[in-house]
């Protein structure tokens, strides 16, 4: 019979095999990005000593004491030569928290730091915090902006589902010690708030997503833009929409900025999520757009349709048919690591380059917003290619 210590050893060996498994690029693709064979982080990647009491006296059956349900929606940053994700971890109790995992190469061997992030409370404590966007700002701080969820105390008696969403703010110098700042003050509920990495006219710039309720965007027109004077007491006084929602598109129900944009010689590269309604519920996909270098509110490229959508096992999970991103890393050589969650369950990576993503944005046709317009766009490409084919 296997001893307690032997069982513990087997747990650690199995975990180490998962952590060190080499990830493999999936070569067949569309030329824009490369997916990888395995998820980069799952609930099973969390340390054994997070989930099991390793004391035989208090856990003689070696049972899991603290269950982990999912690893999802991660901010990302290059830090001291390592690729770091600040993950949204969800426990079996449904509570989310933040934890850092680091990799030497960005595609595999992600290891969690020993302890999760300790995040202090705002004046009004939040029940749940999640989906952190990281920005290394030119002021010298690394900011994390995340959703802070609380029960809606104005809900009818017995309604234990209604909630409110605000943008929580914290900052750090080392990703270990976090200074909690007051939540962002806004006229509406907010999710998907992202800090622009540079000052604009001497002010901090935020990408926002105003919404009427906890889930529904309602009258919120899309991805917004606001300038604030001080992140230690941030307040949105004026807000304008820079990327609108449109009927019968991949972002008709709602959309939201993903990670902070990447600065390129041609403009700011943006990655966002779009949501549409279908018979199976809400479908989340990723899309891109670009804004002008001298005016980040000015759209200069809006490729039509989605950039990435769920495929294969990505389609299945706690909330199926969903891709979501709030983290990417652009290396100095131009390689881009896109970290995305599938179906609120696991984290993946896809790689591309700045040049490819700019080309995709600049040269993909816009959405004509009707079937007839889409056909005309398709016919133009067919005509061009048929002329080329006759020369072969």
Question: What are the roles of these predicted feature ranges?
Answer:
Residues 1-73, 77-127, 136-194, 198-253, ...:
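Beta-rich carbohydrate-recognition and catalytic domains
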Residues 260:
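Active-site/ligand-binding surface loops and adjacent short beta/alpha elements
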Residues 312, 329-337:
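Well-ordered alpha/beta subsegment
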Residues 323-327:
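Extended, compositionally biased non-globular segments
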């Amino acid at each position: 019979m296997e001893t307690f210590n032997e069982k513990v050893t087997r747990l650690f060996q199995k975990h180490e095999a998962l952590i060190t498994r080499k990830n493999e690029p999936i070569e067949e693709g569309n030329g824009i990005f490369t997916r990888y064979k395995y998820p980069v982080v799952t609930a099973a990647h969390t340390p054994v000593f997070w989930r099991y009491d390793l004391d035989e006296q208090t856990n003689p059956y070696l049972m899991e004491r603290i269950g982990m349900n999912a690893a999802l929606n991660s901010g990302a940053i290059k830090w001291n030569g390592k690729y770091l994700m600040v993950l949204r971890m969800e426990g079996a109790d449904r509570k989310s928290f933040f934890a850092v995992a680091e990799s030497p190469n960005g595609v595999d061997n992600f290891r969690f730091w020993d302890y999760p992030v300790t995040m202090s409370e705002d004046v009004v404590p939040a029940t749940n915090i999640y989906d952190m966007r990281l920005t290394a700002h030119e002021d010298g701080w690394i900011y994390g902006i995340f959703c802070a969820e609380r029960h809606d105390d104005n809900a009818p008696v017995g309604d234990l589902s209604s909630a409110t969403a605000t943008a929580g703010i914290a900052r750090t110098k080392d990703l270990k010690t976090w200074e909690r700042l007051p939540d962002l003050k806004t006229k509406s509920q907010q999710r998907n708030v992202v800090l622009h990495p540079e000052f604009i006219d001497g002010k901090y710039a935020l990408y926002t997503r105003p919404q009427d309720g906890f889930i529904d965007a309602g009258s919120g027109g899309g991805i917004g833009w606001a300038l604030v004077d001080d992140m230690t007491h941030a307040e949105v006084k004026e807000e304008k929409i820079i990327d609108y929602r449109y009927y019968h598109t991949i972002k008709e129900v709602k959309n939201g900025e993903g990670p902070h944009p990447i600065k390129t010689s041609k403009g700011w590269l943006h990655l966002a999520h779009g949501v549409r309604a279908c018979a199976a519920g809400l479908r989340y996909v990723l899309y891109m757009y670009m804004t002008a270098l001298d005016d980040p509110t000015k759209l200069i490229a809006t490729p039509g349709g989605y950039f990435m959508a769920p495929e294969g096992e990505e389609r299945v999970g706690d909330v199926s048919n969903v891709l979501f991103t709030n983290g990417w890393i652009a290396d100095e050589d131009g390689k881009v690591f896109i970290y995305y969650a599938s179906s609120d369950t696991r984290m993946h990576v896809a790689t591309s380059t700045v040049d490819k993503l700019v080309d995709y944005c600049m040269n993909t046709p816009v959405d004509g917003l009707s079937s007839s317009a889409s056909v005309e766009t398709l016919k133009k490409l067919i005509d061009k290619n048929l002329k080329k084919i006759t020369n072969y």
